[in-house]
Amino acid sequence: MSAEGYQYRALYDYKKEREEDIDLHLGDILTVNKGSLVALGFSDGQEARPEDIGWLNGYNETTGERGDFPGTYVEYIGRKRISPPTPKPRPPRPLPVAPGSSKTEADTEQPVLTLPDLAEQFAPPDVAPPLLIKLLEAIEKKGLECSTLYRTQSSSNPAELRQLLDCDPPSVDLDVFDEHVLADAFKRYLADLPNPVIPVAVYNEMMSLAQEVPSSEDYIQLLKKLIRSPNIPHQYWLTLQYLLKHFFKLSQASSKNLLNARALSEIFSHVLFRFPAASSDNTEHLIKAVELLISAEWSERQPAPALPPKPPKPTSIANNSMNNNMSLQDAEWYWGDISREEVNEKLRDTADGTFLVRDASTKMHGDYTLTLRKGGNNKLIKIFHRDGKYGFSDPLTFNSVVELINHYRNESLAQYNPKLDVKLLYPVSKYQQDQVVKEDNIEAVGKKLHEYNTQFQEKSREYDRLYEEYTRTSQEIQMKRTAIEAFNDTIKIFEEQCHPQERYSKDYIEKFKREGNEKEIQRIMHNHDKLKSRISEIIDSRRRLEEDLKKQAAEYREIDKRMNSIKPDLIQLRKTRDQYLMWLTQKGVRQKKLNEWLGNENTEDQYSLVDDDEDLPHHDEKTWNVGSSNRNKAENLLRGKRDGTFLVRESSKQGCYACSVVVDGEVKHCVINKTATGYGFAEPYNLYSSLKELVLHYQHTSLVQHNDSLNVTLAYPVYAQQRR
């Protein structure tokens, strides 16, 4: 048995973002069952415009995966007869039975039963039927963020659903059912009502209103008035209101469940109206009516803001956040030069409006990045700096980053971008981070440092091995895809040769038969068989290569999955290790001892092994502090010096200093922050009471922990060599 479907070709690579998605690679062929599009309310002809459909569910013939993929990433090829999938099929949404029509085959086996009329199921002050309330509460509890809710049919048969609906509401335990069974039971409930929630009696008047009233707001008010007519029991209006509240809650989570007002109206309009067969125009009017009702519910019920995470200690907004004269380094929400991965970790599972600021990854002087939580995702906003002014876009009007942030703590960012209708509510404070180190003596902390460093090194080696395998597999897959394309071209050429040869061979065989030339007939047959055999060999080779490619693609996805699972552990282990290392450094532990715990064998730096560092030139600030010098002068002073030669100067960034150091024969520059907690290169390392203390620490500690390109210590003060 086969069904009708559509074929699409991937135009771009797509890496899946959700569990139900599938990966796409350029050129992949995908098949979508026609029934799945019909179930979502799409009509014939729309399949040719996948970008208008949005997300499609189908089968990737290249990789053998089934799941969702974006319509904007594919192009339509044509129709195809397909076999329905055998493992856990995803059937199209069943259509409701129109009044007066015969039941489906599945339903003929069941007794024709309906629920009591809504007017008989409850009465005010109740707001809806008890069973309906219990069903929707369970669905909202379990499946509010489920991306397949109301789109995927459960495995329960009609008899089981009917049995669930016939239960006594107070006694039934809905926790034993998953969200898809509950969703099917809800749909079955609406379908089994003797009359639809929006009565048939208002259908004709409603269609007239749709054509006569152009204003959406006026139409909604008249539609509500129509449904609340004295001729219709009040329970119908109360039930509709309760359903709209449910749809409103679902649409609030549409970034995760994909159920916006339009999608919900397409799914439920037919069962809310349950009208006789109508034209497509009328159907669209009814879908639009439900969409407007849900949207009106949205506008009438603005959601309360999410509660912020409770901070360890209260912070006074008046004293802290709203002080425009505060230095940027002292702002609790400014984290300096931290990575995007660390930002994502700090903002994970936080409320909308949570934010922090870091240095821009472009490293342009004075540019920063605001990361803001909105709609469950992180939004990155560039803060530009030009001519002493700051802002998100031209014209730049704020005198400082602090003033900019304070402004948007009171005003919505919708002023800047209409899609960012949120304020900067909850700063991620660098002063309120959890204390990682729990041990209370140096030896115990050192042992823990050794354990975490060992785990970090093992994870790093595993990640590096997987990355090499990932790169190699990616290259091999690309080569095999190229080879398959070459096979396809070759087969096409041979087949083009085969067709005319068959025609000519047939003519010549007839001719030689008449002449009795058996030898020529045998030669023609032999050549024809040889060509056919060659085509078969090429097709077999292509098939084997396609099987290899399919296996390797599965391996490739598995490697990628393992890499993604390791990466968060790697980041967390590094952060924990660095916290222990920082704690020991603050306690004055010597680098030699730290190297033992870290397992560092390279301890040949002439300063790192000196037991008594009193003779170090670093103690004399005049050997490295050059005062108000600029970048060009610093580079001239350090040009030609050996790696590790350094100086410290005042930075063009107000209130900060800059360290210039020779690395791999080049002069590099990095900012030294001056904050309320001390000097340092980045949070949470701004803890040195003076520049001298910072220089002495990094005399034996590499700067690589702050910047991968700075694998060097502050070994040689620029003027120390001249004084020897």
Curated annotation (Swiss-Prot):
Keyword Protein transport: yes
Residues at the site labelled Arginine finger: 151
GO biological process: B cell differentiation; cellular response to fatty acid; cellular response to insulin stimulus; cellular response to UV; cytokine-mediated signaling pathway; extrinsic apoptotic signaling pathway via death domain receptors; glucose metabolic process; growth hormone receptor signaling pathway
One Pfam assignment: RhoGAP
N-acetylserine modified-residue sites: 2
Occurrences of domain SH3 (ranges): 3-79
SH2 domain boundaries: 333-428, 624-718
Domain Rho-GAP as annotated: residue spans: 113-301
Keywords for the protein's UniProt record, in alphabetical order: Acetylation, GTPase activation, Phosphoprotein, Protein transport, Repeat, SH2 domain, SH3 domain, Stress response, Transport, Ubl conjugation
Ranges for region Disordered: 80-109
Record-linked InterPro entries: ISH2_PIK3R1, PI3K_P85_iSH2, PI3K_p85alpha_SH3, PI3kinase_P85_cSH2, PI3kinase_P85_nSH2, Rho_GTPase_activation_prot, RhoGAP_dom, SH2
Residue list for modification Phosphoserine: 154, 279, 608
Tissue distribution: The P85-alpha isoform is widely expressed. Expression of the P55-alpha isoform is highest in brain and skeletal muscle. The P50-alpha isoform is abundant in liver with lower levels in brain and muscle.
Single GO molecular function: insulin-like growth factor receptor binding
One of the record's GO cellular component terms: phosphatidylinositol 3-kinase complex, class IA
Keyword Membrane among record annotations: no
Quaternary structure note: Heterodimer of a regulatory subunit PIK3R1 and a p110 catalytic subunit (PIK3CA, PIK3CB or PIK3CD). Interacts (via SH2 domains) with CCDC88A/GIV (tyrosine-phosphorylated form); the interaction enables recruitment of PIK3R1 to the EGFR receptor, enhancing PI3K activity and cell migration. Interacts with phosphorylated LAT, LAX1, TRAT1 and LIME1 upon TCR and/or activation. Interacts with phosphorylated TOM1L1. Interacts with CBLB. The SH2 domains interact with the YTHM motif of phosphorylated INSR in vitro. Also interacts with tyrosine-phosphorylated IGF1R in vitro.
Comment field on protein domains: The SH3 domain mediates the binding to CBLB.
Job of this protein: Binds to activated (phosphorylated) protein-Tyr kinases, through its SH2 domain, and acts as an adapter, mediating the association of the p110 catalytic unit to the plasma membrane. Necessary for the insulin-stimulated increase in glucose uptake and glycogen synthesis in insulin-sensitive tissues. Plays an important role in signaling in response to FGFR1, FGFR2, FGFR3, FGFR4, KITLG/SCF, KIT, PDGFRA and PDGFRB. Likewise, plays a role in ITGB2 signaling.
Protein name: Phosphatidylinositol 3-kinase regulatory subunit alpha
Organism: Rattus norvegicus (Rat)
